[in-house]
């Protein structure tokens, strides 16, 4: 009788934000599971349920049984904007504006393996997954609060003396692209398996900002949403004992965001300046990628190397917005 395994992993991982942990594309995120943050390589994984997203074909190489895994990734972030002490003849207070709002990124993975086939399901955050909150505004709100001769709304907000020094500002934003994947894999030979499936992406972005001056105030809220399907394919090859190679192709996800906007600035000036006036559409795809991973035991069962490469196909995506 084959050994049956039920693996249930619930991981709460608290990490500091570093560039390596957030590695990905312009929009894509690679930190889809806690085990990726722990190892920084999962493209050839055949050991845990998150193989469903990193190496879907490799799920057919796992031992028979049910594998389940739930992750909650808590990322501590510290972003800052350094402001100038002056813009031309206009003196500013300068200094640094900070946001230390953490990000909470969930992940859910399930794999069922039987004989030569497997089925899997996962919920991940393949894009976005972040939140910022600048209680005193940031560089953008500072520029928007400049006096009218400098191209801002400072005169409207604060009267003749209105400028960033005497206008209260704040801005916050969050973005989550939730991906739901369903697929399967089949072991053609003992050394080769193929897999694939479909992914549904529900993308959401929200931006909220406000400014208060002696004369007027401005409130802006922008929600951008869209949803789409894409597909993925995978191959897993184990040519010799202790060596495994995983290959995954994720197709481009076409997203055409629609803006739902409330803007009290004169003539909707703020939302129009970024191209997100109410009802407007903007293509901003979630690019596809090719992931390759190698896992090799130098010393069987003791020492293993796992080089990984993920190449994002951003040239094939349509990105109309300025990034």
Regions found by a protein language model. Name each.
Residues 19-127:
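N-terminal, post-signal peptide beta-strand-biased segments of exported outer-membrane/organellar beta-barrel
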Residues 1, 6-7, 89-94, 272, ...:
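Short intrinsically disordered, low-complexity coil segments enriched in acidic
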Residues 1-3, 68, 198, 240:
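Short, intrinsically disordered low-complexity segments
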Residues 15-16, 67, 211:
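Hydrophobic alpha-helical membrane context
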